[in-house]
């Protein structure tokens, strides 16, 4: 009989850290999923190296709490506070961080890196900790029958593909191409086909049919006035590409993606093998409102980001969608929330909005241990009218 046990360690009003999920599937295979909340390293001086040292230290402690290590990490999100609207400044920060990224992990943990990675410059307002230069979120898995390699988690009878985010950057005739021109629909189509559909097809996976989640970043700092024009172009390209097989997910503006000449960076989650996919049949903001995958008697629910003006209402909507997908609810089955607070030009107003958001958020969870969480300031989420948004991943067995 399949079993799921969710352990929410060190809970506070807005998140637990880390969240540990111990799973036994109906094949009697046991594995654990570990999801620390987003971490910063501001216990050390305010420079890239010191904060990265502190972030690794914090995340490593989270992993050890759950009996796993850095070589078990399969997903890494790097979110940089935007240091400037100037391209060259962002390029330098990116290069400086990348120079210390892997060497410091290796030296501090003694582990190799098996994880994918998706990075972006989020917004000048940054994160709940106002001095943080970046925030990092990781996910890990360990089990006797589980292997992790380059973003692919192989459970033996099914595979969970979580590749790194990709832009239009590619090689041609020995040269690195970073842009294919101003047509965003063509840029999105190129990335989807060349970086995802084609290599998945070579591996025998139907990318369109088997994508269950999609996060889409749209860079806007080179021309902020076109923020929502760009998002709508990319959203339409996404809708046309997937048709009736729409995954759940989200789309939002970021300052810049790592390929500073590119605009679009999508990152999918794709499953293959002995795993079934179910979609809600309801489309909102271009995405299925929820998608489930079921393997070995275990079901995961991925709910698209719900936007609005009140975090409590957004959480209530997520709760109803998890129930609609067959789960007990967000408080019972939720393992991780990604929170997005829309920032404007006034830093004080942005900070006040975060306080309100957290009050609404903690009010909904009052009396229970919340799921893990990462929160970030963004220039928007899903639609221009939304002031905040939350997406969630939940797991249960019937």
Describe these PLM feature segments.
Residues 1-80, 84-212, 221-331, 337, ...:
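N-terminal presequence-like segments and the immediate start of the first folded domain
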Residues 216, 339-341:
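Short tight loops/turns at secondary-structure junctions
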